[in-house]
C-alpha cells in the first residue's frame, strides 16, 4: 500500500458548498491612471499579473483570489502579501465560525481551500459567460463542493502539495532573477556613460574627443505605419506568388525574428498595404506596443504595425534591436503615451525617440556582448521552464490523488497506486 493509500484509507469527509464556509467578495475599482509601475502593494484585478501598484491595500496577506472578468476569468491565485483587490476579482476568505466549529488551523485550511480551487480552475474558466467581457459568476463559486477532512489529514495533504508549489515558485523566481540580471547588463551596456567609456577604451581617445551624440530615430530611419487593404478577406490568397501577410500570431513567444506567416495576400492587395524587406523592423503600435521584431522575410504589414527601415548605413540591426528592447526605450514609449491623449504608439512618437549615434564597429561590439548574454539566458530559459513544467505536472498529479473524494460514500476514492 502506498503512502497516499495509507494516508487516505477510510477517510470520512463532510461536504460543504464553498459559499457556506467562505466569504466570497469582489474588490473595489481603482483608477488605472493613479497606478504606479513600482509601488508598495500590487493591484489584483481580472488578469493573471498585477495591473499595477499603489500605496493602499484592501486585502491582507495569504488570501485566495479568483479572477472574475476578462480573458483570464476563473484564474485562481494565492497572494502572500497585502494587496489591493480590484472590481474584477473575488477574494475567498474562510469564515471564522467554520474554523472554530471544526477546530481547523487557519493557515492549513486556507491552503487546503486554495488547492481545492486550483483543481477546479479549468471548470471555472470553462464556465465563463457573457458575449462581451466573459465572467465567472459568484453563484458558480458559491456552489463548488468542498470536502472537509480531519485536521490531521488536511495538514498532511497541504504539506505534501505545498512542497511541489514551493519548488515551482523557487524555479520561477530563479528564472526571473536570471532575466533581471540580463536586463541590468543590457541597460548598462546601452547607457550613455558606458558607451562613452567603451569608445574611449576602443579608440584610445579622451572622453571629450569621443562623446556619444544623440539624434532622433526619425532623422536616421524611415518610420511608417502599416496599411490594410479592405476588406482583407478579398485579398487573402494561397497563390505561391502571394506576399506574406504579417500578423501578431505569426510571431513566437520571445522571438526576435519574423520567419514565416500563416497567410499571404495578393499583389493587388499588397499595393494598398505597406511592403517591407528582409532586415526591416516592425513594432506593434497598440496593445503590447513597442516590442521590436526583425523581418527575416519580405512581407506586408497592416495598420496595427509600425515599421522602421532604411537605417542600415548608420545602425547595426542587432544594436538597434537591443536598444529598442531596453528599459530606457520602453519607458520612453510609456511616458509619451501616458502624457498625451493618444492611446497607441504612433509614427510621430517613434520618430521622436532619442538614439545614440556611435561608430558602427562599436555598435557591433556591444551587440556581440549582448548576444552572449542572450545566449546564456536562452539556455537557462530552455532548462528551467522544462523543470517547472515537470514539477507542475507532479503537483497536479498528486493534487488529483489527494483531493478526489467520493461524494456519495463520504469516503476518499482511491483506485490507483503509485
Model regions: which residues?
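Charged, alpha-helix-forming regions
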Residues: 1-418
